[in-house]
Amino acid sequence: MSETNSTADSRDVVLRSSIDRSLRHPVMFFFTSGAVWLALAIVLGLVASAKKHSPEFLTCFSWLDAGKVDAAHMSAMIYGWGLQAAFGIIIWLMARLSRKQCTAAGVILWAGHAWNAAVFYGVVRIMMGEGSGVTYMEFPSEVWPVLLLCYSVITIWSLIQFQVRDAGHVYVSQWYLLAGLLWFPWIAVTAWVFVFLMDGHPLMVTGVAAWFKGTLFSLFFLPVALASSYYLAPKVTGRPVYSYNIALFGFWSLAVFGPWGGMQKLVGAPVPQFLPYAGAASMILILIPAIAVGYNIIRTVIGNSEVVAESPSLRFTAAGIVLFIVFGVLSVLLHTVPAMKLTQFSYTGYGFDILGLYGVFSLCAFGAIYFIVPRITRREWLSRRFIKWHFYCSLYGVSSIVLCAVIGGVTQGQGIEDLSQPFGTMAERASQVGWGVTLAWAFLLIANLFFCLHLLLMWARLGRRSSHPTLLKAHHPENPHGPEGEVDNYSSASA
């Protein structure tokens, strides 16, 4: 019996190694190019934030005007970093969970290069003043067909791997991956058609753009982050997911509430009143999947606090899940009728967006990257100090942005609503908030310079040649990354 088990384990190791080897180049390409785009996006965010409280900053460069640099900043973060990090996570996770090698690595790699070229072209056009001006869809109209084609070429192979997998259970992570893979083209094509192809009323364009902005996070970035979390939590701890039923409830609650978000941005606009309030209700109800997922993941890792503290992947993932719960709580507080009157035209919305994109998605993506990269490069991370600095500076930076923007935005909104005060008083309040946000972006820049450098060194295969993972504390005899066999993250553990 032991000899049979040993043979099965050997075959399993060979299969995992072959899967990792087949995906090494495309996955590392997406992670490293995404990290470079993230560093650029943070630099642009630093400049955009500085211009809000110091308008004379860099006025000698017309291509760094406030409107241009702000649009380029968010576009680089979403399409340069966010989508590419998601691509790397999706194709690796789906291959591992489907237990199928990738046979189209070259095609995926070429599509990745085309994606980067399209994003670069779009960012340059924005900074030349030739963007569309549509929120989260700032790229010129000719860029979107290229991006949609590249997306199809990159992700179709993951759907094929799932289809041809051996019969068996569908993992919790695969629910979210499949949902995100299918939801993104739906929302992207719908928004592209209504915004760029149909000659509709500008108010329709504004509404569709607001819907796209809300659903891009809830129906793509969030499912990818949760898929990664549901994979890493049982994998690193060596325990199954706490409750299958809670996982199912969290998935379907996100699927039901997520598509309604976004329209809350149109409160007070001349649109049917049920639209913005349906969007606000959706954002309030997002607390339900946040609590369900947070409770499930926390109960999965509870009792393994030492593993969470030592494992880079699990530490980032746990931080991302906690911030997802914070995101849900803030959704409730900021989308009531009295709150929306104060936050509609203030810093608050920006802070809330950064909490979702960086606090939830990016931290979970960092956790996945710290887990995946050693397996596809066959090298361990060089420095635990780099990882620690990346974690603490990231957590401090994103927390500071959210606190400054949300709290400062509410006081800014109160100043706008108080007609007895001069407008200059409100502008002074906004300026004080801007300084805090700018300082926080500086911390994020430091964090991601460490991350980008570390990742580039791993891509060059300059990591440590060791069978022991790089831990955030001194090494101990147990492996905090768990056994390399597939952990059943579909079955329910006893309470």
Language model: regions and residue ranges:
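Short, intrinsically disordered terminal tails adjacent to the first/last structured region
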Residues: 1-12, 474-495
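Cytosolic juxtamembrane amphipathic/interface segments immediately preceding
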Residues: 12-27
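Hydrophobic cores of alpha-helical transmembrane segments in multi-pass integral membrane proteins
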Residues: 27-53, 66-100, 104-129, 142-162, ...
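Non-cytosolic membrane-interface motifs at loop->transmembrane helix junctions
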Residues: 133-144, 169-173, 204-212, 272-282, ...
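Alpha-helical transmembrane bundle and helix-membrane interface signal
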Residues: 164-167, 239
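Short, flexible helix-coil linker/hinge segments at the edges of structured domains or between repeats
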Residues: 195-207
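Long amphipathic alpha-helical scaffold segments
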Residues: 303, 307-310
